[in-house]
Amino acid sequence: MPRFTTLTPEQLEYVRTFFLMWGRLLIPKLVPGAHVVVASNPLLSYIVSGALADAGLERRGEIVRLTMTMRGGDRPKSAHEDFPEVSVMPRSMWEPWVVYRKPIEGRVQDNLRKWGTGGFRRPSRDKPFGDVILSAPTRATERRLAPHPSLKPQAFLRQLVRAVLPMGKGVVLDPFAGAGSTLAAAEAVGYKSIGVEKDEHFFDMACEAIPKLVQLTPDVNR
């Protein structure tokens, strides 16, 4: 939803209840130490995060997608000339992805040996995975292949998806697959993945778009 959308208390409670129930349903399907990463926005991330904590997952921080969008920064509606130096709210220049983990069994090293989970895969031995990822808006090339309203760029997703399987083994699950961009990123970095999408239109779009998105060579500096 647009970042500036104002939700009623009842709608906010619906969001909280949805992610609480979703988290509870998800936990039995996860191996110990598996990470859950959920894209959000600065206005709703606290609700999503609190619901996942209440569901029984443990908070492990946030991934910040550092990007400028077209949302926010506007002057007061119908009073632009009266308040030319005022922005109603900050223009969005980042996107929070909340990070949670199913509790591990014993120590991290024990969990890694048994389940292959519990941490994040480093970009290299000398460089840890960081919680800020520079990212340009999704390129027009990708949007033409997969015209989904919330399509994320491959340059960003491939870095994130690669990191969530610390041993490079396992299955990436996207329960809100949309046009398949996360699944394409998993395929591109050599991971197995499963996607779930209830919208038939977007399901068909994903079936067509995933092979094409996999073939893209994204600019990782974007």
Language-model segments: residues:
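S-adenosyl-L-methionine-dependent nucleic acid methyltransferase catalytic domains
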Residues: 1-222
